[in-house]
């Protein structure tokens, strides 16, 4: 029988995902066959598995930390907010329904069956399962509808460790309140972790001792505030979308990613901000756009709405002017669609509007269909075939025009085709994750170095190795600051 451990939190963004990631790596390093699991995830940050299924990005990163291939059972239910249209429900990697928040709860029975099916699958395949909760388990108005927190813990009789975020303040009250509101599950709570602490741990000692007495649970560690982990945080979009110019003021190549209202998969650009000769920021301010060498329109969960926003702010005009002046404009997925001439939506997949003018910088039109394309891809840059790329597609539209920027194979569909288009200094593609390609990243940056009279740099760091080092560093920090032997004892290891 597989061993179990569940990490829950007193709130969203308290550090559950990163702690699970660290524990997966620590366990892997002990030679244990471990896997992550999160029954239900709400996020616009998703990942496509080898078989074309869509799961939360956090579970894909946790699987990487565990040394296993991500699959749809690690996150059987993925919720993707779609604004006024409601919530897209992705079940076992495929779009199931789009519902409003009220109707969503009527699906509990069906979704719970999917959750337990996935649990049973993973328990057979692995020796240890580290389970992540969602938000707070103490949302007492939703307890009867729960399929992700105490419902999972009770179903498995899994020991639960509760994480509290001291950086927000009120950590003792939130830990105490969570346990006391869930007294019927008291036997499942085995201890707590205080996360994001700034200062000397001795200051906390009186409070920790008092809380241990009040709830009769031990403190298993105090984790310091980590300014930079290098690991994408699904809840951290507001924290991530900050101005990085100040951090590398002398870097020659300035990149601005448009800070869209419905931005998705912002992790696409993480590799760019670690390059030594780039400055990366997210902005919609005209003064920032005017100083940029490269402007990227990212993916969007609501392409029409974000395109309307750009029009209201007259950013579409600014982009056209900058393109004439030689600034490189790039569109990824929804951003690619926006750069075209028209977006046509006969089935009203994206909007009540059936047709919308694009920015007009690429000679393409996009037609939206209800079916979603989800697949991993691999290929090369057509103009320089030695530049290899990998990534994934996740979109509903099909874009028509003289495509030929990349030659790709959709691996889960066994289909070879051309993707993307380039028109002067403007280009677009459907492929997420292309900047994880070390050679493509350096190709992009070097062209701007040469333009500025600088020599190109032959070397580019390995993003794959850097990610591994980020996970190792996180794991070392967590292991150092937890009573890890007691954690393993709780898990029965």
From Swiss-Prot:
Transmembrane domains' residue ranges: none
| MF GO annotations | ABC-type vitamin B12 transporter activity; catalytic activity
Which PROSITE patterns does its entry note? GATASE_COBBQ (PS51274)
Q: Where on the tree of life does the source sit, at the highest rank?
A: Bacteria
Q: Name one GO biological process term.
A: cobalamin biosynthetic process
Q: Which residues form the GATase cobBQ-type domain?
A: 252-440
Gene3D superfamilies found in the cross-reference section = 3.40.50.880, P-loop containing nucleotide triphosphate hydrolases
Determine if Manganese is one of this entry's keywords: no
Q: By its UniProt entry, which InterPro entries does this protein fall under?
A: Class_I_gatase-like, CobQ/CobB/MinD/ParA_Nub-bd_dom, CobQ_GATase1, CobQ_N, CobQ_synth, GATase_3, P-loop_NTPase
Name the NCBIfam families on file: cobQ, PRK00784.1
Chain's role: Catalyzes amidations at positions B, D, E, and G on adenosylcobyrinic A,C-diamide. NH(2) groups are provided by glutamine, and one molecule of ATP is hydrogenolyzed for each amidation.
UniProt lists the family membership as follows: Belongs to the CobB/CobQ family. CobQ subfamily.
* Name of the protein: Cobyric acid synthase
Give the originating organism: Thermodesulfovibrio yellowstonii (strain ATCC 51303 / DSM 11347 / YP87)
Gene name? cobQ
């Amino acid at each position: 029988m597989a061993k179990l451990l569940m990490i829950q939190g007193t709130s969203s963004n308290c550090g559950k995902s990163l702690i699970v990631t660290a524990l997966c790596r620590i366990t892997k390093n002990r030679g244990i066959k471990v896997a992550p699991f999160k029954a239900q995830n709400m996020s616009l940050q998703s990942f496509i598995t080898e078989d074309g299924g869509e799961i939360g990005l956090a579970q894909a990163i946790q699987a990487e930390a565990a040394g296993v291939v991500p699959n749809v059972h690690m996150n059987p239910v993925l919720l993707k907010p779609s604004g006024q249209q409601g919530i897209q429900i992705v079940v076992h990697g495929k779009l199931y329904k789009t519902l409003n928040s009220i109707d969503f709860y009527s699906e509990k029975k069906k979704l719970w069956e999917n959750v337990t099916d996935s649990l049973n699958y993973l328990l057979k395949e692995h020796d240890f399962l580290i389970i992540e909760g969602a938000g707070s388990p103490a949302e007492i108005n939703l307890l009867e509808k729960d399929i992700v927190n105490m419902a999972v813990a009770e179903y498995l009789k899994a020991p639960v460790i509760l994480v509290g975020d001291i950086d927000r303040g009120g950590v003792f009250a939130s830990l105490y309140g969570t346990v006391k509101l869930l007294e019927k599950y008291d036997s499942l709570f085995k201890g707590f972790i205080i996360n994001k602490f700034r200062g000397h741990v001795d200051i906390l000692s009186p409070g920790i001792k008092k809380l241990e007495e009040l709830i009769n649970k031990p403190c298993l560690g105090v984790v310091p505030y980590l300014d930079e982990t290098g690991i994408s945080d699904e809840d951290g979009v507001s924290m991530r979308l900050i101005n990085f110019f100040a951090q590398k003021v002398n870097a020659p190549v300035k990149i601005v990613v448009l800070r869209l209202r419905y931005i998705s998969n912002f992790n696409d650009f993480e590799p760019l901000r670690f390059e030594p000769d780039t400055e990366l920021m997210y902005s919609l301010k005209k003064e920032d756009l005017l100083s940029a060498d490269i402007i990227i329109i990212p993916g969007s969960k609501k392409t029409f709405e974000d395109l309307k926003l750009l029009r209201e702010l007259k950013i579409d005009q600014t982009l056209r002017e900058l393109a004439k002046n030689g600034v490189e404009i790039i569109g990824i997925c929804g951003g690619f669609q926006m750069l075209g001439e028209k977006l046509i939506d006969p089935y009203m997949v994206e909007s009540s509007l059936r047709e919308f003018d694009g920015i007009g910088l690429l000679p393409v039109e996009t037609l939206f269909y209800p079916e979603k394309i989800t697949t991993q891809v691999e290929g090369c840059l057509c103009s320089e075939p030695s530049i290899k790329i990998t990534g994934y597609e996740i979109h509903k539209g099909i874009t028509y025009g003289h495509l030929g920027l990349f030659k790709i194979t959709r691996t889960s569909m066994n289909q070879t085709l051309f993707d993307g288009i380039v028109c002067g200094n403007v280009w677009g593609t459907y492929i997420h994750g292309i900047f994880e390609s070390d050679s493509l990243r350096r190709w992009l940056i070097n062209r701007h170095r040469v333009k500025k009279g600088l020599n190109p740099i032959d070397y580019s760091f390995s993003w794959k190795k850097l990610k591994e080092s980020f996970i190792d560093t996180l794991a070392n920090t967590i292991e150092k600051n937890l009573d890890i032997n007691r954690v393993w004892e709780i898990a029965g290891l």
